[in-house]
Structure formats: C-alpha cells, structure tokens
C-alpha cells in the first residue's frame, strides 16, 4: 500500500520550457547556451551549482566570465526562471489534497536561484511557497548529489524513514525512474507538460 509520494519539481509540478531558458541565457551573453543546458541533467558549472559545489555567487561570477560581462544576482535568477512556465494551481491544489492521506516529499535537481523563487510567496498565485505543499524538500544543491545518483535517494530514505515499496516516485526523467525502480520504489513517469492528476489517482486507487 502506498503511504508516501515523492515528486520531482521541474517537469512534474512545474512544466519546463528548455527553449525559453536557452534564449534567456543567450540574452545574458552565453552564446553556447543550447549546448550547456539540459532538461534532465546539467553539465559544467550548471551541474556544479546543482550539486552544491558552487555557491550562487560563485556561479554568477563564473557565468559572467563566460558571458564576457558582470552579471547581477537578479539577472542570473531570471535566466534560470526561464526554464519554467506558469505554475498550474490545479496541480498544487491536487497535491495539497494528497497530503490528507499521504506523506508528500520533493526530490529535485535544482539550485538556489530557482528555490529562492519556489520557496517564496511569488511561487503561486495564491501566495503560497512550495514548502506549503510538501512535508519536506530534498534539494540536490543542499545534499551534494543529483539524481540519478543513488546517494541522493539513500539520504532521502534514511532522513524521511520512508520504505521504498510503500512509496510512489513521480519523475519525468527516464534515468531517474530507472534508479527509483532499482531501489524498490513504485514509479510513475508522466511527460513534461502533462496533466497527470487523473492518472495518478488511478495508480493510487489500484
């Protein structure tokens, strides 16, 4: 029986628009943004930021070096937010409803620029931060690992005391779903942009 649900952030709770993000970073001056940005797993300084190896300010400085000019923290943040489309309140309300019957967690490859927005009242039109929708957030840059590394899953399992066989892992990334299955989680892989609420309800009721 499912007792816990672990959601991914980008591509599940909030839809991702990689092309918009690429254009935002090109506008900053990063001419090769298209080769540096990935929907599922970053590389270079982008990966180092998500793994917590670079602080937000260190990333800003190194990105500025690549762009050939000094960038502000706000400019850098807005470029990162280019990844995300408008937050769908229907999904957020659905997740709130799930919390009446399940423990709800977030496991995300992310960074402090994105989370400074997501964990603020600006996140939703109702003025609620992401924290209000989950029991706990497990964020790659705070934990020093990114999915699909087993270490980030292991930390979440030990910290939350979830039993994988009693936990549904919801993620749009194939490699993340693969490791989730290997670790014993029940899994569900919706497509980025999909309204997965009805399908998830069927899974939980089966």
UniProtKB/Swiss-Prot annotation:
Its EC number is 3.1.3.-, 3.1.3.104. It catalyses: D-ribitol 1-phosphate + H2O = ribitol + phosphate; D-ribitol 5-phosphate + H2O = ribitol + phosphate; 5-amino-6-(5-phospho-D-ribitylamino)uracil + H2O = 5-amino-6-(D-ribitylamino)uracil + phosphate. InterPro entries: HAD-like_sf, HAD-SF_hydro_IA, HAD_sf, PGP-like_dom2. The active site is at residue 8. Its cofactor is Mg(2+). It comes from the Bacteria. One of its GO terms (molecular function) is metal ion binding. Pathway: Cofactor biosynthesis; riboflavin biosynthesis; 5-amino-6-(D-ribitylamino)uracil from GTP: step 4/4. Keywords: Hydrolase, Magnesium, Metal-binding. The keyword Hydrolase applies. The keyword Magnesium applies. Gene3D superfamilies: HAD superfamily/HAD-like (3.40.50.1000), Putative phosphatase, domain 2 (1.10.150.240). GO terms for biological process: dephosphorylation; riboflavin biosynthetic process. Mg(2+) binds at residues 8, 172. Belongs to the HAD-like hydrolase superfamily. Catalyzes the dephosphorylation of D-ribitol-5-phosphate and D-ribitol-1-phosphate. Is also able to dephosphorylate 5-amino-6-(5-phospho-D-ribitylamino)uracil, and thus could be involved in the riboflavin biosynthesis pathway. NCBIfam families: HAD-SF-IA-v3 (TIGR01509). PANTHER family: ALPHA-D-GLUCOSE 1-PHOSPHATE PHOSPHATASE, FLAVIN MONONUCLEOTIDE HYDROLASE 1, CHLOROPLATIC. This is D-ribitol-5-phosphate phosphatase. It comes from Bacteroides thetaiotaomicron (strain ATCC 29148 / DSM 2079 / JCM 5827 / CCUG 10774 / NCTC 10582 / VPI-5482 / E50).
């Amino acid at each position: 029986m499912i007792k816990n649900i672990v959601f991914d952030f980008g591509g599940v709770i909030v839809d991702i628009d990689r092309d918009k993000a690429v254009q935002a970073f090109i506008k900053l001056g990063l001419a090769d943004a298209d080769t540096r940005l990935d929907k599922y797993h970053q590389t270079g300084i982008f990966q180092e930021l998500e793994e917590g190896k670079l602080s937000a300010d260190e990333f800003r400085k190194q990105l500025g070096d690549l762009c050939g000019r000094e960038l502000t923290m706000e400019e850098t943040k807005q470029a990162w937010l280019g990844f995300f489309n408008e937050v769908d309140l229907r999904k957020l309300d659905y997740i709130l409803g799930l919390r009446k019957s399940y423990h709800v967690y977030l496991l995300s490859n992310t960074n402090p620029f994105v989370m400074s927005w997501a964990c603020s009242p600006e996140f939703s039109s109702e003025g609620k931060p992401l924290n209000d929708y989950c029991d706990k957030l497990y964020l790659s840059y705070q934990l020093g690992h990114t999915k699909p590394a087993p270490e980030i899953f292991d930390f979440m399992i030990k910290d939350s005391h979830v039993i994988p066989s009693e936990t549904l892992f919801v993620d749009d990334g194939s490699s993340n779903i693969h490791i989730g299955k290997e670790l014993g989680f029940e899994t569900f892989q919706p497509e980025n942009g999909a309204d997965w609420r009805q399908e998830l309800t069927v899974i939980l009721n089966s």
